[in-house]
Amino acid sequence: MADRLIRLGHSPDPDDAFMFYALAQDLIPTDGFRFEHILRDIETLNGWAKEGRLEVTALSVHAYAYLSERYRLLPHGASMGEQYGPMVVVRDGAAIEPDQLPSLRVAIPGLLTSAFLELQLAVGRIADPVITPFDRILDVVEAGEVDAGLVIHEGQLTYETQGLRKILDLGEWWHELTGGLPLPLGANAVRRDLDEGDTLPRLSRLLRESIAYGLEHRTGALAHAEQFGRGLDMDLADRFVGMYVNDRTLDYGEDGRAAVAELLRRGHEAGLIDRAPLVDFVED
């Protein structure tokens, strides 16, 4: 019997590349599955998930509020901030404070990104969000095309090199708000119609094995991930991957699962999510 094709969507960034290194390089047995890696920015993947286009996909925890009828969350593959996370940056000389952001032009990586939900929970609704490819946000802030930028991915480590300063760290804000919960950002999810026999638990175990392989073979996984770092040297790539691929990526933990539910609950109560969220994890 031919291997079953699984289209696996993830972002072209170092942490996702690190997670799926073992699968991309055929370093572990794939248990009757064949993977096609499809790399797109997270907002594109969020949109595709509304259509159920991919069998397994990275998506924003925020977006999952609208996707739970099509997808279940995998119990691993999460990106979470531990007192750090997406941040808002402005030009170094700009006299801008967080409470001014609702009335300013703010570059964001997407309306369904977790970072945008968290920003609005922190400061209120942003009246003029400017949707911008995540890898251009630092540039448009530096150029003065917007007043501020919401930075995800490796820009969190490099913004100062472009003459920018941080005015808000959403990981710090969330930690204080919730009494220490990690900040939910990205998740991996599997389409519900694969729930036949043992398909879902087998897939889940295999994807966890890929993450574990990367953590156990860090040098090779980092070399693979570095090519997606958009100018990061190996030391910075290692630092960035360490922020978002770690033991919690192997399993959310009870507090990680609680954090997902808490974020979506707060978003719904604030009127930022228009449906009561269902949080449904695959158990493997």
Q: Could you tell me what each predicted segment is?
A:
Residues 3-25, 39, 86-148, 153-157, ...:
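Bilobed "Venus flytrap"/periplasmic-binding protein-like clamshell domains
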Residues 6-7, 70-79, 105:
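A structural signal for short loop-to-beta-strand junctions that line the ligand-binding cleft
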Residues 15-18, 28-60:
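Extracytoplasmic small-molecule ligand-binding "clamshell" domains
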Residues 41-43, 52-65, 133-134, 151-157:
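Beta->alpha turn/N-cap motifs
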Residues 73-96, 176-193:
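Hydrophobic/proline-rich hinge and linker segments of small-molecule sensing/allosteric domains
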Residues 135-226:
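Pocket-lining segment of extracytoplasmic ligand-binding domains
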Residues 195-266:
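Secondary-structure end/capping motifs
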Residues 266-284:
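Conserved C-terminal helix/tail region of periplasmic/extracytoplasmic solute-binding proteins
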